[in-house]
């Protein structure tokens, strides 16, 4: 992406925008919210939402250093639903290391390591076609049926 679409500045938005620092853990009504710093060059936050015995971990813009990062696996262990960045193939990653995004195989390994009950791989490379994504998802599901690719408008029962 390039100007004027990227980067987007707060001043270019036609809305009142305010920013707040949030603590590592807090509540929004009955929902417990925990945060973890992501590994991304522009900074990013990973969120864990827990309510009524179910938990969701949202980890986009995340470039893990290994297939089982201890800090992330401890944070996400046993979550009901893991939404995890999986933008690149290993071949693409060679050219995009340190961009702040994971590979599909690494994200699959992490989902297994942290014991997520369901996983949706998200933050797909925008250059991929729907057909390419479907083929990649089919390959992943052969060995990991609880791991799927996230889709726009998708609903998941927890």
Predicted segment positions?
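Cap/insert and terminal regions of metallo-dependent hydrolase folds
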Residues: 65-153
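Binuclear metal-dependent hydrolase catalytic cores
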Residues: 1-57, 63, 67, 72-73, ...
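Structural beta-sheet core signal
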Residues: 57-58, 121
């Amino acid at each position: 992406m390039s100007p004027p679409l990227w980067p987007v500045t707060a001043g270019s938005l036609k809305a009142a925008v305010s920013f707040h620092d949030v603590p590592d853990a807090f509540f929004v009504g009955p929902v417990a919210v925990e945060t973890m710093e992501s590994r991304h060059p522009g900074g990013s936050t990973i969120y864990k939402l827990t309510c009524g015995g179910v938990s969701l971990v949202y980890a986009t813009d995340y470039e893990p250093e290994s297939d089982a990062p201890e800090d992330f696996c401890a944070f996400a262990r046993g979550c009901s639903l893991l939404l995890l960045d999986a933008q690149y193939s290993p071949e693409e990653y060679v050219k995009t290391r340190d961009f702040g995004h994971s590979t599909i195989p690494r994200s699959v390994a992490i989902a297994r390591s942290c014991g997520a009950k369901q996983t949706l791989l998200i933050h797909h490379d925008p250059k991929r076609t729907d057909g390419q994504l479907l083929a990649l998802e089919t390959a992943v599901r052969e060995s990991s049926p609880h791991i799927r690719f996230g889709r726009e408008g998708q609903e998941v029962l927890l």
